[in-house]
Amino acid sequence: MPMILGRIDRTAFVMTDEEWAEVNKGSDWPTFTGLACVIALTFGAITFFTWRFESLWIALVVCPLAVSFFNQVAQVTHFASHAALVPSRHIEMLVGRISSAALGYTLDGFSRTHLSHHNYLNGPDDGDRLWAVQRITRCHVLTTLLEDLFGISTGRRALQYYFDRQAKLRTTASNILLVVVTQFAILAIFHTVRGWEFYFLFYVLPLISLYPLLARLRSTCEHIPLCSVEGGNYWYARTFDLNFIERFVLGPAQQHYHLEHHLVPNASPRQLQKIRGFLEARHDLRPVKARSYLALAWNILWMPSKGVLHQQK
């Protein structure tokens, strides 16, 4: 199936040997170390403001920090599932399992559904179908966002990752135990800093409400078809030109290079930026960057088309 990436047909994208050699230059360890430091600092900031909590205004600081932390950890899980995090597969798997456990699910459950997302993007066989965009209307978008906000999608996601026979998941007891141990460790940290109730207020609540809502919003912006293409079914993906705040909260670890990720799924965060450079250097294939997630989301929700954003042919 062809893929439309910005304005690129996937079949037209072929990198030369020289370009691949340039992409593979360097080490992924510095990028991984930097990301690990950012994750640690973000979690440290969450615990600090939890410790200093005196009014609800603090929640306006903690909640964006929590969403950023979840997205950072999710990107670690994401790249580990693609074997694109660090050269050592053993370390990669260990870090990936711990990071996924911090989000309440297993690496195996995520990997199987997400990799089918790359094979069957937004189609009926997309194992990541909770975020898939197949037939979308303004009413449908708003309804699903409300489901995300009230934790309904989180429950469905858990059932999908742990018990979905269609995705052929194999969730072992040891993987579930790691999730339980990791969550108890996070609970212990919050209990030590301020109290166990803040684990539910500043960690669990954003994790099951704000995080899935914003993840849905981002995924919709990354993949929603905004135009009809004659001649068959197409996949869509796009890259975003984000400001610092959006990049920190919604698109950390090169998440915004989503077009390039679908072109080369096993590219590391460091390599995605180089691939983007090669795309922009080709005048015949130069893709268009979307301005921001929030700007595109606003246009999607209020696009004047009788409530129907897109109808695939």
Where are these regions (language model features)?
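Aromatic-lined glycan-binding groove of carbohydrate-active enzymes
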Residues: 200-220
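Active/binding-pocket-proximal capping segment
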Residues: 207-209, 224-228, 280
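Short helix-capping and inter-helix turn/linker motifs at the boundaries of alpha-helical repeat units
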Residues: 88-90, 179-180, 248-251
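Membrane-interfacial segments at transmembrane helix termini in multi-pass membrane proteins
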Residues: 213-247
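Active-site-adjacent structural elements in folded domains
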Residues: 81, 172, 242-245
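Membrane-interface motifs of alpha-helical transmembrane segments
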Residues: 84-96
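Non-catalytic, topology-defining segments of multipass membrane proteins
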Residues: 1-69, 76, 93, 100-205, ...
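Histidine-centered catalytic micro-motifs
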Residues: 73-83, 110-122, 218-225, 252-267
